[in-house]
């Protein structure tokens, strides 16, 4: 399934693997993902707790996060709220103009993952990713992001993602994507198409000069209830 996501503001991008823009990624410990292009290294700690009004709400809906004008200080839901056992297992980015695959990462099969001591596991492991891109990614016009995910034994109704990107707490762009219905115990694949407007040279230079001050919140809803919240930050300098 191929879908175009709406959004505005600035665009993200990745730097070349083999001459095309392609990133390296620093995921937090849990994913243990196998990268097919780019590289991985140890991330710094994710965002620290900074409670706000939304953390105190029992039910957070799309309208709550669409009103946010800066990055959240903490996660707005716990990992336990993913009662549908939604698990993202593969992610690929390609340049829509050239068709070049810029980046691809996947989780190894469960049988190949290292054993984990649950007592020592960070409850937020796997919810924060640090990306390292080159400046070329900021000049891409259209990028396709293919995601593959599985769901548990519950039907998933009205699955929706809202993703908001900020630079220095200024909203750059907001994307809103509807996955729709997912049947229980299924594996699903779809491609989001991101249309990026051109960025000013001044903004590009600022984003390059200030690595990891570009940040994003990804909110996932089922039946208009927040069930997952992931975070990321980005460097466009091309160096760790």
UniProtKB/Swiss-Prot annotation:
<comment type="subunit">
    <text>Interacts with CABP4; in the absence of calcium. May interact with GTP-bound ARL1. Interacts with ARL2 and ARL3 (GTP-bound forms); this promotes the release of myristoylated cargo proteins. Found in a complex with ARL3, RP2 and UNC119; RP2 induces hydrolysis of GTP ARL3 in the complex, leading to the release of UNC119. Interacts with NPHP3 (when myristoylated). Interacts with CYS1 (when myristoylated). Interacts with MACIR; interaction only takes place when UNC119 is not liganded with myristoylated proteins. Interacts with LCK; this interaction plays a crucial role in activation of LCK.</text>
</comment>
<dbReference type="GO" id="GO:0005813">
    <property type="term" value="C:centrosome"/>
</dbReference>
<comment type="function">
    <text>Involved in synaptic functions in photoreceptor cells, the signal transduction in immune cells as a Src family kinase activator, endosome recycling, the uptake of bacteria and endocytosis, protein trafficking in sensory neurons and as lipid-binding chaperone with specificity for a diverse subset of myristoylated proteins. Specifically binds the myristoyl moiety of a subset of N-terminally myristoylated proteins and is required for their localization. Binds myristoylated GNAT1 and is required for G-protein localization and trafficking in sensory neurons.</text>
</comment>
<keyword id="KW-0597">Phosphoprotein</keyword>
<feature type="binding site">
    <location>
        <position position="131"/>
    </location>
    <ligand>
        <name>tetradecanoate</name>
    </ligand>
</feature>
<dbReference type="GO" id="GO:0000281">
    <property type="term" value="P:mitotic cytokinesis"/>
</dbReference>
<feature type="modified residue" description="Phosphoserine; by CK2">
    <location>
        <position position="39"/>
    </location>
</feature>
<feature type="modified residue" description="Phosphoserine; by CK2">
    <location>
        <position position="37"/>
    </location>
</feature>
<dbReference type="GO" id="GO:0000922">
    <property type="term" value="C:spindle pole"/>
</dbReference>
<dbReference type="GO" id="GO:2001287">
    <property type="term" value="P:negative regulation of caveolin-mediated endocytosis"/>
</dbReference>
<dbReference type="GO" id="GO:0007601">
    <property type="term" value="P:visual perception"/>
</dbReference>
<protein>
    <recommendedName>
        <fullName>Protein unc-119 homolog A</fullName>
    </recommendedName>
</protein>
<keyword id="KW-0963">Cytoplasm</keyword>
<dbReference type="GO" id="GO:0007399">
    <property type="term" value="P:nervous system development"/>
</dbReference>
<feature type="compositionally biased region" description="Low complexity">
    <location>
        <begin position="13"/>
        <end position="23"/>
    </location>
</feature>
<dbReference type="InterPro" id="IPR008015">
    <property type="entry name" value="PDED_dom"/>
</dbReference>
<dbReference type="GO" id="GO:0045171">
    <property type="term" value="C:intercellular bridge"/>
</dbReference>
<dbReference type="InterPro" id="IPR037036">
    <property type="entry name" value="PDED_dom_sf"/>
</dbReference>
<dbReference type="GO" id="GO:0006897">
    <property type="term" value="P:endocytosis"/>
</dbReference>
<dbReference type="GO" id="GO:0051233">
    <property type="term" value="C:spindle midzone"/>
</dbReference>
<keyword id="KW-0206">Cytoskeleton</keyword>
<dbReference type="InterPro" id="IPR051519">
    <property type="entry name" value="PDE6D_unc-119_myristoyl-bd"/>
</dbReference>
<feature type="region of interest" description="Disordered">
    <location>
        <begin position="1"/>
        <end position="61"/>
    </location>
</feature>
<dbReference type="Pfam" id="PF05351">
    <property type="entry name" value="GMP_PDE_delta"/>
</dbReference>
<dbReference type="GO" id="GO:0005737">
    <property type="term" value="C:cytoplasm"/>
</dbReference>
<comment type="similarity">
    <text>Belongs to the PDE6D/unc-119 family.</text>
</comment>
<keyword id="KW-0813">Transport</keyword>
<dbReference type="GO" id="GO:0042953">
    <property type="term" value="P:lipoprotein transport"/>
</dbReference>
<feature type="modified residue" description="Phosphoserine; by CK2">
    <location>
        <position position="41"/>
    </location>
</feature>
<keyword id="KW-0446">Lipid-binding</keyword>
<feature type="compositionally biased region" description="Gly residues">
    <location>
        <begin position="1"/>
        <end position="12"/>
    </location>
</feature>
<dbReference type="GO" id="GO:1900186">
    <property type="term" value="P:negative regulation of clathrin-dependent endocytosis"/>
</dbReference>
<keyword id="KW-0716">Sensory transduction</keyword>
<dbReference type="GO" id="GO:0008289">
    <property type="term" value="F:lipid binding"/>
</dbReference>
<keyword id="KW-0844">Vision</keyword>
<keyword id="KW-0254">Endocytosis</keyword>
<dbReference type="InterPro" id="IPR014756">
    <property type="entry name" value="Ig_E-set"/>
</dbReference>
<keyword id="KW-0653">Protein transport</keyword>
